[in-house]
């Protein structure tokens, strides 16, 4: 349907308002550190990383994937955190109120767009949350695999800070084999690349050696600690 100039002007204003508003996602910092462990990543960086991974890894999926749909899904999936804030993957108390906070945020943020685009984004966000379609499963795989890779590269820094246990990571990723056995095998290799060094916390993560490093010199506090007790 052809739109009038007035309708186009209104539509563009709404789109610009949304574009400027979602710039705030750059100030929402996650608990995962960048690969160099210098600082934590923000939601914009995380979403960009997932979109790139979506292009690169689709051949490892068990089902055919609508790539364009997945890319939009991962680019918008965390926009609700502008209002709701980031809920750490292993924060049980935060998880209890997460859905309520994010539903309210979705109403406001996607409501800034022209109605048709707002409904499209809201539908994709709900599809991601439902975790049922091949695209939603792929998006979740990416959302789980990316922080695992960054924790591997950074020596498990965020896991060490939060006292995350091996069992928690396995539990969080228990549905990944539904989507890709190959990616799951790689994830298990990362998860299993840990050593127990504390009798007080037998499952606590401490990296023996990062899969991404090829040097005998301790690269970070965790590796240095392991060497000192080994």
Residue ranges and their predicted role:
Residues 1-230:
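Alpha-helical, largely C-terminal catalytic domains
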């Amino acid at each position: 349907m052809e739109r009038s100039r007035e309708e186009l002007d209104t539509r563009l204003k709404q789109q610009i308002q949304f574009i400027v508003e979602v710039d705030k996602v750059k100030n929402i910092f996650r608990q995962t550190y960048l690969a160099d462990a210098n600082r934590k990543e923000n939601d914009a960086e995380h979403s960009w990383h997932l979109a790139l991974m979506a292009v690169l890894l689709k051949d490892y999926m068990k089902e055919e994937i609508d790539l364009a749909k997945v890319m939009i899904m991962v680019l918008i999936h965390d926009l609700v955190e502008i209002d709701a804030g980031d809920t750490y993957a292993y924060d049980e108390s935060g998880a209890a109120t997460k859905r309520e906070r994010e539903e309210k945020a979705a109403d406001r943020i996607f409501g800034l767009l022209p109605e048709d685009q707002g409904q499209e984004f809201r539908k994709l966000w709900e599809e991601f949350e439902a975790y049922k379609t091949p695209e939603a499963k792929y998006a979740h795989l990416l959302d789980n695999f990316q922080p695992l890779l960054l924790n591997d590269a950074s020596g498990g820094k965020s896991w060490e800070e939060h006292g995350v246990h091996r069992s928690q990571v396995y539990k969080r990723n228990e549905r990944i084999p539904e989507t890709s056995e190959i990616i799951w095998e790689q994830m298990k290799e990362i998860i299993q690349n840990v050593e127990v060094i504390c009798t007080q916390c037998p499952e606590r993560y401490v990296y023996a050696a990062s899969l991404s490093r090829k040097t005998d010199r301790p690269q970070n506090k965790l590796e240095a600690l392991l060497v000192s007790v080994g």
